[in-house]
């Protein structure tokens, strides 16, 4: 019986995919699904294709340039009888070029190491929007018809927001079973700057509206980041396009003005929090 399905979107160097696949333990209860995105449709499309092929009770997502640590096998053993909707596990990160520790998993580490279980659960549900380090129940996914948006960047945020909203029972394992590889030529960074800004704005806006629909009083302040960055650089045409994207998504002028007024405060809180945690402050679009 297939218990786990690991889905890997692939568009990049073959050696990275080979390393990722080789890090997945050989088990009779595990299915590895590689979706080759030769036409550049995006990781969201590839993950949706993988979901349609998944036979496991739980699905786990990996990026082809990342890999699993040996403890991943023990993690799978420990959750064989689990019935939670989503099971979170931890990660570390390295810089691809130097092999030195990187910042990409710092936000997850901070959540995992929190001594406040209420804060931890809220942040895992609504702040940790990456698809990796989650084992998500396939029956839960089917019940709520959860899928990835097929944008070129941030295609995972709407999926993760739905998982966070609808999951009735979650479990947390703090072992670092996954390694996130940070490198300079990622998909998010290689896309045309203005297209990236608009995708970024659109996907965070959709996520915010979904949270509001279910009465969750928080919003991704980074929704405004592309527009505010464009304003600061006097790229007013790009800023207006971002504004239009948020209006098309359904935001009223009054709500957007309210968010703009509070944005400097939220940005400062983010910088202070990251500085206190010893994290590198990364505010580029797409990170």
Name what the model sees in each region.
Residues 19, 26, 44-45, 84, ...:
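Membrane-interface aromatic/basic loop that binds lipid-linked glycans or pyrophosphate carriers
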Residues 59:
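Short aromatic/hydrophobic "clamp" motif used to bind/position activated sugar donors
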Residues 8, 12-26:
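Short, well-formed alpha-helical segments that are part of the catalytic scaffolds
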């Amino acid at each position: 019986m297939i218990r786990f399905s690991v889905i890997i979107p692939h568009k990049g160097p073959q050696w990275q995919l080979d390393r990722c696949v080789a890090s997945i333990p050989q088990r009779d209860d595990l299915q590895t699904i590689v979706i080759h995105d030769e036409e550049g449709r995006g990781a969201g499309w590839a993950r949706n294709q993988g979901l349609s092929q998944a036979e496991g009770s739980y699905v786990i997502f990996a990026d082809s340039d990342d890999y699993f640590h040996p403890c991943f096998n023990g993690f799978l053993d420990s959750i064989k009888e689990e019935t939670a909707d989503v099971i979170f596990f931890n990660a570390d990160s390295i810089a691809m070029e130097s092999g030195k520790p990187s910042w990409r998993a710092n936000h997850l580490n901070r959540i995992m190491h929190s001594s406040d279980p209420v804060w931890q659960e809220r942040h895992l549900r609504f702040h940790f929007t990456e698809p990796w380090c989650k084992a998500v129940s396939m029956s839960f996914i089917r019940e709520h018809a959860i899928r990835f948006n097929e944008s070129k960047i941030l295609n995972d945020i709407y999926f993760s927001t739905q998982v966070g909203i609808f999951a009735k029972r979650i479990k947390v394992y703090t072992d670092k079973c996954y390694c996130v590889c940070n490198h300079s030529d990622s998909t998010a960074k290689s896309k045309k700057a203005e297209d990236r800004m608009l995708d970024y704005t659109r996907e965070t806006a959709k996520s915010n509206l979904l949270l509001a629909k279910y009465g969750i009083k928080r919003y991704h302040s980074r929704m405004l980041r592309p527009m505010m960055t464009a304003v600061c650089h006097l790229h007013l045409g790009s800023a207006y396009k971002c504004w239009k994207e948020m209006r098309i998504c359904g935001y009223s002028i009054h709500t957007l003005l309210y968010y703009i007024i509070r944005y400097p405060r939220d940005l400062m809180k983010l910088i202070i929090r990251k500085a206190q945690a010893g994290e590198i402050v990364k505010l580029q679009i797409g990170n």
